[in-house]
Every structure is written in structure tokens, then in C-alpha cells.
UniProtKB/Swiss-Prot annotation:
Organism: Chaetomium globosum (strain ATCC 6205 / CBS 148.51 / DSM 1962 / NBRC 6347 / NRRL 1970) (Soil fungus)
One GO BP: telomere maintenance
Protein name stated in the entry: ATP-dependent DNA helicase II subunit 2
Domain annotation Ku: ranges: 232-479
EC number: 3.6.4.12
Keyword Hydrolase: yes
Lineage, uppermost ranks: Eukaryota, Fungi, Dikarya, Ascomycota, Pezizomycotina
Domain of life according to the entry: Eukaryota
An example Gene Ontology molecular-function term: helicase activity
Family to which this protein belongs: Belongs to the ku80 family.
Length: 736
């Protein structure tokens, strides 16, 4: 199929299109243009010169078309609003101002189709194009059907698809029928339906269905991308005659779809006004009169006491990349940098085979590829087929080393035979495998037993689920099964969440917002479509159906509601009491903690604050934690205890915010900075301040974080920005 497209939209702008019908609060024109704007904005966003479109206005006040200019009758009140060609953002906004209802009924819909047909024939000539005419009307204007058969024959001859979408047109397949339809509209609707039926490639539908289907995300069609074209080898064919070599091609089977990117531009204001910077979709044309592209310029400076201002500029060519090694940086010149790269050659080599049973699916990493034999190469097809059947019969996978091109990073991939091998589609799927450094091995206690320190195995324990709980959970999982919850057209159970209907809400919500903003920059963006939110929560009907299993699970697990932990100063005097009402501290004879130790500072600090009955206790705890932070910094060998001190400081900050006493933290932090920068804490501890406190976002508590704070964001920023040391990880070569 040709990739070039030529589409002409015919929009009825008659006086009746300004009316509202069937309980809608928008006019027929606005209702129909929801479909047209969506299609046009999608074409503009694609930014492909081969996707062209034009717009014809029907029932316009003026007349502007080639047929009327040639003196032909019956083409009055038809205007070409946009000639066929690629459309830009500027043209889209100009077109928007032209779409206005008129005060006439004089335009004929079939004549409008002839105008659009002639535009397409003139533009496409005899070249390969997907030709399409889309008519949007409410069918209230008179239509002359004498030439409808000739028009249909001409559409068929030019291989043009005709799509007629009517506002409130009857559609038995969709299940819509307009009540109290006027005789004129019914007659026109019948005429247009007959015209579509005479076309080899025609579609007749109602606007209600077209607008409803706009909410369904459209998946961007992609062409097969060949990532590899070469030999798949087993052994070294250059050394051994018995080595296997099959010429294969590799294509992407799954690939992550990114969200639309954005770029920063400057919005050009009116003369005398200030420019404003905005972030827009990258597809925005920078030649637009409203926008100007932003160019980034970067300068490099180093400290130089002899230079004006104490700094001098350094050229980019004099810089060298450096890698952090402990607390120092190891520089690499451009010539030395090649040493760090692994020299590889394009290859696809099988290293060995493993059985199905020894492979864990969680090792799958990254995007999947599909490997097929080279086209029109019978020897390669036979060789790959033999390999696939051998893997399938022996229930084995192949492990291969894949290098896409010379100099590329090598990958380990798992080659899987196509499970549907009996469908005469023979291929290998490759899945990237992790290297040893990519694996994360963690030890967790078993879920079905408890191991004691003496090595005994306990099957019944308070930490293990009972048989009743296991059965209740099993019943709950079965009740929440989605595999057969939905119903197909024949009323049979089917999958509720098939993969081809689980759309990425981020991508399509972004596209929806971009299209809406492109068409009307001032209109509010509508909420996300329901289909994008469908899988954000379990189906309500399924939850209602599984309610008995849910209640049984709650009873078996003995789930009880725990009172929420109260926040704020007014609630700290009343600690949470257990549901039993017993005073655990008095029963155990333990007194409340009043001191904080260095080795267990964080839990003990939280314990004191949880039972604090007055402000003096909180101030004492904050003072003790502050002393511990100072001691950790002072006793630290280099930066050994900096992270620990920062963690204590973070806990102190969070707890004092929750208790609405930010002044204690702010007072301590101000004094801590003076101590650090003055060298009172046994040497130069500025790295603690700038890397761990400022870099860790542990600055003063501002009014944005706590309403009772007296510190503004500007004051907190000023405290962080004072006397920043020169810490850099780039080196430069002195060319003097």
C-alpha cells in the first residue's frame, strides 16, 4: 500500500449547523468538528510531507472553487478553504478561524464531492496515493442527486474512498435512530447512502459513533526495522568446516514506545511586551511566527586568582573526561579514552544450549527481537528451520552473543523457538539476558516455614498463614480472575484485559492534550478518556461478585482497623492506645526514655517524640539529636560518617515538621553551618554541608513545608548558596 495520502475534508457550514439537537449543548458544527479536528491535528503532529490534506467549505457565504470559475452551474456557495498539501500549525490556526457557520443553504453536497474529487485528481495525478474524501454534514441542505451515479463512477475510476459521516444520521449497526427526522433530511440521508453504496470503497456512518471512537487510542503504525542482516553461527566457520552458518535477518518484535518529547521555545510577544519561555511539543515548527527556537550556549570556567573576577574561561577542546576514583578523579584524554571501549565486530554467535526447565523468566531483560531467514534464500530457510525444529523437539533454548554492528556493545540473548511452530511460521525470538553485574540477589525468609537458630523447621507459627487463610486467599484469587470476566459479541466469556487493549495512558494522554492545545490554545483540556483509566482499578462488578470471598479473607486474616497516627502539635499529648486499653508500659514496668544514644539515635529519637507530653521534652530530644549530628561530623575520618549524620538530620527534620516545631530545626541548622564553615568541627567539613545537606535537600524548613515556619524560600536558598566551594569532576589541559 502506498504511504502517500491525499485527503479532502468537506465541512457543511450551513445555517442549520449552528443548531443544537438531541440534547447536546454544542452545535452540530462543533460536534462534527470534534472528529475533523482530531484527524487533522493527528496529521499535523505526524509532520510527514507525504500526508497531505485539503478542506472544502459547503454552504459558505462566498464561492471559491475551480468549477464555478470555469462557468459551470451548481457549484455556488462552495469554497476551497485549504488547498491540498502538508499542513502546519500556522495553517491549522488560520483554518480554525475560517470554520464558521453561514446564513445560506445553497451549497450542494454532491457538488462539493466533485470539487474535492477534482482537487485530488489534479494533485495526485497518476501517482500512488491513498485518496480519501470525508464529508461531514447534518443533511439539512437540499441535494441534487441527478449526477450521483456519474460521480460514483468517477470516484471508482480514480480509486478514491468516500466517507460520509452525518450528524444524527441513522445507523442500524451502531444502534442509533433519530426521532422526528425532517422529510428533507431523510431524503438527503437516503441519497448520500445510495451514493456510498455505489462506490467500490465507501463508508457511511453516524457522527455519534465517530466521536465515540475518538476516545480509542490509535496505535502508530511502524515499519519493520531490520536491526541485523548477517550470519547466525555455531562455531567458527573460518576455522572449522563443520561450523554452522545461517544467513538471518533480525527485526524488533517489541520496543518501548516513548512519550512525545518537548523542546523549549520563546513565545514572541507583541511589540513592547516581554517574551515568555514555554516548553512545547518537539514537532512544533520553529519557523512559526509565534515561536522562536532556543539555542543553548555553555561556557567552562576555572578559578584563577590572576584573572578578572577570579575566574577564566576554558575552551571545550582543552577539557578531558574524568572518572571518580574514591575521593579523586582520574582524567582520560581523548586519545586515551579509546582504551575504555571494547573492540567488537558485527556478529551473532550461538554459545550453547540450555533446557526449558533451567531458565527463569525473570531473567528476561529489555526489548524482544525476531530472527528469520534471509528473504529468497532457500538454503538459509532450510538451515534455520532445522535449528528451530531441533530446539522445539529437544525443549531447549540457545544462548547467543549478539553484536549489532562493529564497535557496538555485546549482548547475551536467549533464542526461543516460536511456540506456534505448527502454524508454519518459523522464527526465533531473542530476549536480552542480564550480565552478572545486572543481577540483584537477595535473601528472604521462606514463606512456608520458619527456621530456628538450631536448624529446626517449624510449619506452624504465628508468622505463617494458617490453612484457613491459605484457602481463603486461594478462593479470593480465583474470584478476581480476569481471564474470563469480559463477554464478547456472542455472549461468551473472554479476556478482560487483552494486550491489544491495554494502552499506555501517559502516551495517549499527552497526545490528546497536544492535539487539543494545537486546535484551540485557550480551551480547557478535557479529562482523560475512560478507556485510558479502565485498568487503573479493578472492575466494580468483579469486586461486587467477589465480595463473599473478600469478607472471608478478612475474617481468616483477622484484619482489624488500626487508628490513624495523629499529626500536629495538638495531638502529640495523647499517644495512641492499644485496642485492648491496657497500659503496656505500666505492665512491663518500663519507664519512658529520656536520653538518646549515638548507636541507636534514630529509633530512640522517634520513641521520645511519640511519648512526649510537653514542649520541653521535644526541645530536649532535638538538642540531643543535634549534638549527635555534630559529633558524627567531628569524629568522621574524611567523609566516613557524613551519610550517617545526614540520615539523622533527615529524620530530625521530618519529625519536627510533623510536630509543627520547625523553629528547633532551623535554629540548629543555622548554627551547624557556622560551625562547619568556621572549622570548629575538627577541620574542613564543607563537603558535609554542600554535598550531604544542600545536595540532600536538608535545608531550612520553609513556609511551603510548614505553615508555622517563619522562614521563606528565599531565605532558605540564601543559606544554601553562600560560599560554595569549587568542586569539579572535569579536568583541563593547560595549553599555555
Amino acid at each position: 500500500m502506498a504511504d502517500k495520502e491525499a485527503t479532502v475534508y468537506i465541512v457543511d457550514l450551513g445555517e442549520s449547523m449552528a443548531d443544537c439537537h438531541n440534547g447536546r449543548d454544542e452545535s452540530d458544527l462543533d460536534f462534527g468538528m470534534r472528529y475533523v479536528w482530531d484527524k487533522i491535528s493527528t496529521t499535523v503532529a505526524a509532520s510527514r510531507k507525504t500526508w497531505t490534506l485539503g478542506v472544502v467549505g459547503l454552504n459558505t457565504e462566498e464561492t471559491n472553487n475551480a468549477q464555478d470559475s470555469e462557468g459551470l452551474e451548481g457549484y455556488e456557495h462552495i469554497s476551497v478553504l485549504q488547498d491540498i498539501g502538508p499542513m502546519t500549525m500556522t495553517q491549522l490556526r488560520e483554518l480554525r478561524s475560517s470554520i464558521q457557520t453561514s446564513h445560506t443553504y445553497g451549497g450542494d453536497a454532491i457538488s462539493g464531492i466533485v470539487v474535492a474529487l477534482a482537487m485530488i485528481e489534479l494533485f495526485t495525478k497518476k501517482l500512488k496515493y491513498n485518496r480519501r474524501i470525508i464529508l461531514v454534514t447534518n443533511g439539512e441542505s437540499p441535494i441534487d442527486d441527478e449526477s450521483s451515479e456519474d460521480v460514483a463512477n468517477r470516484l471508482n475510476y480514480s480509486n478514491i474512498e468516500l466517507i460520509v459521516i452525518g450528524v444524527d444520521f441513522d445507523d442500524a449497526d451502531y444502534g442509533f435512530k433519530e426521532e422526528d427526522k425532517s422529510k428533507g433530511k431523510a431524503r438527503n440521508e437516503k441519497t448520500l447512502r445510495k451514493l456510498v453504496e455505489q462506490c467500490n470503497n465507501g463508508v457511511f456512518g453516524t457522527m455519534q459513533q465517530a466521536v465515540e471512537e475518538l476516545a480509542i487510542p490509535r496505535i502508530k503504525p511502524v515499519r519493520p526495522f531490520k536491526a541485523y542482516d548477517g550470519a547466525l553461527t555455531l562455531g567458527d566457520p573460518e576455522k572449522y568446516k563443520s561450523a554452522l552458518s545461517i544467513h538471518v535477518e533480525r527485526y524488533f518484535k517489541t520496543k518501548r514506545a516513548p512519550a512525545p518529547p518537548a523542546s523549549t521555545v520563546v513565545v514572541n510577544s507583541e511589540p513592547g511586551g516581554a517574551s515568555q519561555s514555554e516548553t512545547l511539543n518537539e514537532d512544533t515548527e520553529m519557523g512559526d511566527a509565534e515561536f522562536s527556537g532556543v539555542k543553548h550556549m555553555r561556557t567552562y570556567r576555572v578559578n584563577d586568582p590572576d584573572a578578572p573576577g577570579g575566574k577564566r574561561d576554558v575552551e571545550f577542546e582543552d577539557l578531558a573526561k574524568g572518572y571518580q576514583y574514591g575521593r579523586t578523579v582520574v582524567p582520560f584524554s581523548e586519545s586515551d579514552f579509546s582504551i575504555t571501549k571494547l573492540e567488537t565486530k558485527k556478529s551473532f554467535t550461538i554459545l550453547g544450549f540450555i533446557p526449558f526447565s533451567s531458565y527463569n523468566p525473570f531473567l528476561n531483560l529489555g526489548e524482544t527481537g525476531i530472527v528469520v531467514a534471509q528473504k529468497h534464500n532457500e538454503e538459509a530457510e532450510l538451515g534455520l528451520s532445522a535449528l528451530i525444529h531441533a530446539l522445539h523437539e529437544l525443549e531447549s533454548y540457545a544462548v547467543a552473543r549478539y553484536v549489532q554492528k562493529d564497535g557496538a556493545q555485546p549482548q547475551l540473548v536467549l533464542l526461543k523457538p516460536n511456540p506456534a511452530i505448527e502454524d508454519d511460521f518459523e522464527c526465533l525470538y531473542d530476549v536480552p539476558l542480564p550480565f552478572a553485574e545486572d543481577l540483584r540477589s537477595y535473601q528472604f525468609p521462606p514463606l512456608d516455614k520458619v527456621l530456628t537458630v538450631t536448624g529446626n523447621i517449624i510449619k506452624e507459627h504465628r508468622l505463617l498463614p494458617s490453612e484457613d487463610l491459605k484457602q481463603a486467599m486461594s478462593d479470593f484469587v480465583d474470584a478476581m480472575d480476569l481471564s474470563g470476566f469480559d463477554v464478547d459479541e456472542d455472549g461468551k466469556p473472554t479476556e478482560y484485559a487483552p494486550i491489544d487493549e491495554t494502552y499506555n495512558p501517559t502516551i495517549h494522554r499527552m497526545n490528546q492534550a497536544i492535539r487539543a492545545r494545537a486546535v484551540d490554545p485557550d480551551a480547557p483540556i478535557k479529562p482523560p478518556a475512560e478507556i485510558l483509566l479502565r485498568f487503573s482499578k479493578p472492575p466494580e462488578k468483579l469486586i461486587e461478585k467477589a465480595k463473599p470471598e473478600i469478607e472471608a479473607l478478612i475474617d481468616a486474616a483477622e484484619i482489624k482497623k488500626v487508628p490513624a497516627k495523629a499529626q500536629g502539635r495538638g495531638s502529640r499529648k495523647e499517644p495512641v492506645k492499644p485496642l485492648s486499653g491496657l497500659d503496656i508500659d505500666s505492665l512491663l514496668g518500663e519507664s519512658k526514655r529520656t536520653t538518646i544514644s549515638l548507636d541507636n539515635a534514630v529509633p530512640e529519637f522517634k520513641q521520645i517524640l511519640a511519648t512526649a507530653a510537653d514542649d520541653a521534652t521535644i526541645e530536649s530530644a532535638a538538642k540531643q539529636m543535634g549534638q549527635i549530628v555534630r559529633k558524627l561530623i567531628q569524629d568522621s575520618f574524611a567523609d566516613l560518617f557524613y551519610a550517617r549524620a545526614a540520615e539523622n538530620l533527615r529524620v530530625m527534620r521530618e519529625e519536627l515538621i510533623s510536630l509543627e516545631v520547625p523553629g528547633l530545626y532551623n535554629k540548629f541548622l543555622t548554627g551547624l553551618k557556622k560551625s562547619i564553615l568556621s572549622g570548629e568541627l575538627d577541620g574542613d567539613r564543607r563537603e558535609m554541608w554542600f554535598k550531604h545537606i544542600v545536595g540532600g535537600h536538608l535545608s531550612l524548613i520553609t513556609q511551603d513545608e510548614s505553615e508555622v515556619s517563619e522562614v521563606t524560600a528565599e531565605e532558605a536558598k540564601a543559606l544554601c548558596a553562600w560560599s560554595r566551594p569549587n568542586i569539579t569532576y572535569r579536568y583541563f589541559r593547560d595549553t599555555a
